Amino acid sequence: FENEDEGYFQDPEDCS
């Protein structure tokens, strides 16, 4: 994943 910093592809709820 190029957007590892985003963290939305793994745990969108956790990033919420």
UniProtKB/Swiss-Prot annotation:
**Which superkingdom heads the taxonomic lineage of this protein's source?**
Eukaryota
Question: Where does the entry say this protein is expressed, by tissue?
Answer: Expressed by the venom gland.
Gene Ontology, cellular component aspect: extracellular region
Stated name of the protein:
Venom peptide OcyTx1
Organism encoding this protein: Opisthacanthus cayaporum (South American scorpion)
Quote the subcellular location field of this record. Secreted
**Keywords noted in UniProt:** Secreted
Q: Main localisation, per the record?
A: secreted
